[in-house]
Amino acid sequence: MKTMKNSAAREAFKGANHPAGMVSEEELKALVGGNDVNPETTPATTSSWTCITAGVTVSASLCPTTKCTSRC
């Protein structure tokens, strides 16, 4: 608390080299397992296939023919 109130004491600690809280990007990736993940891709899950199937089914049921018409 004294350091917070005393500007001279704060200045003395300003240049202190203390690595607490400093983590490199490589260390962060290793911690979360990000080294082996390709961020541009997302694996398809079973819920994705369910949504795709439902979307195609609904779309097909709304269109009376497979030909391109003004109604589709």
UniProtKB/Swiss-Prot annotation:
Covalent link Lanthionine (Ser-Cys), residues: 47-51, 59-63
Task: State the compartments where it is located.
Answer: Secreted
Listed A to Z, the keywords are: Antibiotic, Antimicrobial, Bacteriocin, Lantibiotic, Secreted, Thioether bond
**Record PTM (Z)-2,3-didehydrobutyrine, positions in chain:** 42, 45-46, 53, 57, 66
Q: After translation, how is this protein modified?
A: Maturation of lantibiotics involves the enzymatic conversion of Thr, and Ser into dehydrated AA and the formation of thioether bonds with cysteine. This is followed by membrane translocation and cleavage of the modified precursor.
MF terms in GO: signaling receptor binding
Please give one Pfam family short name: Mersacidin
Q: Which residues carry this modification: 2,3-didehydroalanine (Ser)?
A: 48
According to its UniProt entry, this protein's organism is Bacillus licheniformis
Which stretches are annotated as coiled coil? none
Provide the protein name. Answer: Lantibiotic lichenicidin VK21 A2
For this record, an example GO cellular component is: extracellular space
| Name of encoding gene | lchA2
Q: Per its UniProt record, what InterPro entries does this chain match? A: Lant_2_A2
Chain residues in the propeptide: 1-40
Q: Which GO terms describe its biological process?
A: defense response to Gram-positive bacterium; killing of cells of another organism
| Annotated spans, Disordered | 1-21
Q: Output the superkingdom of the source species.
A: Bacteria
Q: What does this protein do?
A: Lanthionine-containing peptide antibiotic (lantibiotic) active on Gram-positive bacteria. The bactericidal activity of lantibiotics is based on depolarization of energized bacterial cytoplasmic membranes, initiated by the formation of aqueous transmembrane pores. When present individually, LchA2 exhibits activity towards B.subtilis L1 (IC(50)=30 uM), Rhodococcus sp. SS2 (IC(50)=16.6 uM), M.luteus B1314 (IC(50)=2.6 uM), B.megaterium VKM41 (IC(50)=2 uM), S.aureus 209p (IC(50)=20 uM), B.pumilus 2001, B.globigii I, B.amyloliquefaciens I, M.smegmatis 1171 and M.phlei 1291.
Where in this protein does the record say 2-oxobutanoic acid is found? 41
Pinpoint the Beta-methyllanthionine (Thr-Cys) cross-link.
65-68, 69-72
| Keyword Ribonucleoprotein in annotation | no
Q: Is the keyword Ion transport in the record? A: no
